[in-house]
Amino acid sequence: GDQQSLAICGRLVPEVVAPPPPPLYVRLPRLLRQAWAILRPAPRIRRMEELLALGAIPRESTGLESWRAVDARMPDLFEAYQLHLVVSSGAGALTPILLGQLAGDAEPSDEHHAIVASVLSGAKNVESADIAEGAERILHGLLAAADRSASFVDRGATEARTWLESENAGEVGVLYRAYMSKHGHRSLRELDIRQPEWAHDPTPLIRSLQTQLRGRLSSTDAERSAAVVNTSPPEGAARFDRIRKFAHIAVRNRERCKSLLVGLTTIFKRAYRALGDQLVAEGRLSDADSIYFLFHEEIETLAAAPPGHALRDEALARREALAYQETLRFP
C-alpha cells in the first residue's frame, strides 16, 4: 500500500491499505519475472519498433471494411501498452524506492522529492527532452532573425504554419521541419485518440512558440539572465551517485518506449479520423468528431446498420454531456 501510494501520489495515503501478501512461493516467481523484465528492456523496445513499422492502417472501400482493418490491428495497440508498462516499470519503481530510502517510515518531504528528481533528471539522449530543446532551437532561430520574429508573433496559426513550412522561413523553417519530422506524432494529451498530433494540427505548438517568443522580445537581457534556473543538485543527492547511471538508462528506455507508443497511437488516430470522414460520407454520422463518442464495438454496429441508426444521436448526446462535465469545478 505504501509503495503504491508513493509511486502514484508521491506521498503516503492512509486510506490505502495493502491486502495481505501472498505466500512467498507465489511472490518469488513474480519478482523474478519483474526483475528480468526491468533488466532486459531491449527486446521489448525492439518489439514496439516492429509494431510501429507495420505502418498505416488502410482505408477500405466502405466504413465497415475500414472498421475491420482497424479492428485487426487493435491487438498491436494492446500489446504496445503492455510492453510500455513493463519497460517503464524500471524507472517507475525507482521513485518509491528512493523516497523510502530517504524518508524511512515518515512522510517524504519536499526536499526528498527534490533529491529524487535530481537523481532521475539530467539523462542524456532522452527523446522526450528534445521536445523542449527542439522548440528552444526554433525560438533561438527566430530571435536571431529579428525581422522575421516580430512578424511571426502576429501571424494567425494557419499563416504561421504556411510560412514555417515554406522556403521563405530560411533556417527557422529548416529547424521547424526537422522538429516536426522527429516529434510530429506528439501532442498534449497525446494518448487521447481524439487529440490530433502536431503533424495534423500544429496550432497548439505554434501558439506556444508565439507566446514564448513574445515574452522574450519584450524582456530585457537582465530579466532573461535572472530567469536562468539553478541546476546544481540538492544536498543529499550525492549518496545516490552509484545508481544514477542505472536511473538514467531506465529513464531513456521509458521515454523511448513512450514515444513508440505515441507513434503507434497516432496510426490509430489517423485511421479513426479517416473512418469518421467515411461514415459521414455514408450518412451514418453527423460529423467526423462524433466518432470519438462511440465505443469501438459500437462503431461496427453503426457501420453495418443502415443510415439513421440510434447510435448517431447517441454520439452527439455523449459529446454534449462531456462539454457540460468540462464546465464543472470542484473545490
Where is each model-derived feature located?
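Contiguous hydrophobic, helix-prone segments at protein termini
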Residues: 1-331
